[in-house]
């Protein structure tokens, strides 16, 4: 396979540092060890311990948080990476593929991407995400503002973003920003978090590995069929567009293509959460192991001795009771289920990576590694279907999700006066840290974290020399990002408590 050289992809350059000239294998490894330290010690990773996986506001420590889930994904990602590299070694491809000094970085990039993969998720998971998008969509009316000319059905509530007669170029920008703000997405927020908010100054390769989707959030045109999977969700915001362009140049990625190691991170997540969600449901007494087995066998269909279901799920179920007294039957079942599942799916993911290496390397492979007609992928799908039918639709889960949706929507309502301020007044509030005519807004502004306020101020300074019409549009954009950044960065418990405090409910 000519043209595959991972040295072209695994860049150890950083956006805020002088170019690195590391050539020795250990010098290169040290660069990525620095990435590991920056990531593991970041506040974003610590906050994952109080963000939900499936069950919001859960007090039982045995039930997974985003952090414990991410640690499990990290381990599976490491396993897949090792499996791929071992097969390259067996085929004597390490040097041919430019990996002779990059074995440790290959693994480390995958591991740290797995650990980071959920850091952009807001409180209450996908329902928190929906709450942010619904709130902004109602005010932005992104579809009513498509194109470059005013439309009678334009329902945008933000004066500076309404389309105006004879302002074609500005209207294109307004439309773009209205779409962008209405498309909050955890993966796009992760890119913003590590680059713009935390300024971790990670290597381009490390950040490239968490760029899971390749569509900008403002995208409103039809999605090309060649990239309909890679572009099915927003991958980055307008605010980070220039950085993503730099990243693509540095990693030799074509527009809308993916970094090759991202496929490994995605497969590790798919393998990990499909089992974890079911184990947490048993821990929460939503169903028993016996009931779970029945649900899975019904989804699989007719089970024949020796088929994959029998080897993975059936073998784990048959272990029930064989080790009485050594561990609980539930722990015993899930230990064997996990071992059996990982033992089958990891080699399959590695094989798919290698079989499709030219497309995977270029980043144009338009599907997940664990998305084919194999028995391994069928097994993964039945795990997911059981979770959808019997876990996510459980009354307790739905009740907590509704509460989470209300909390996030309510917090956006509470902080919305900051978005309603005139640009000049908000600019004065930022500069003076108070505004005599806006006492409520001043107090709300003081509650925003310093990190997010600094990110806004830096963005506002960067656009200071734009023509006034453009400046007003971009200023509102970064102000809205400020509110999204602050609320999406909260933990579940902090968001819940903050909402109760500000609603005077306690």
UniProtKB/Swiss-Prot annotation:
Signal peptide: none
Catalysed reactions, as listed in the record: dGTP + H2O = 2'-deoxyguanosine + triphosphate + H(+)
Superkingdom to which the source organism belongs: Bacteria
EC number in record: 3.1.5.1
Any one GO molecular-function label of the UniProt entry: dGTPase activity
Domain HD span(s) in chain numbering: 66-274
Keywords associated with the record: Hydrolase, Magnesium
Cofactor(s) named in the record: Mg(2+)
Entry's Gene Ontology BP terms: dGTP catabolic process
UniProt subunit comment: Homotetramer.
Family note: Belongs to the dGTPase family. Type 1 subfamily.
Function: dGTPase preferentially hydrolyzes dGTP over the other canonical NTPs.
Protein name as catalogued: Deoxyguanosinetriphosphate triphosphohydrolase
Organism ancestry: Bacteria, Pseudomonadati, Pseudomonadota, Gammaproteobacteria, Enterobacterales
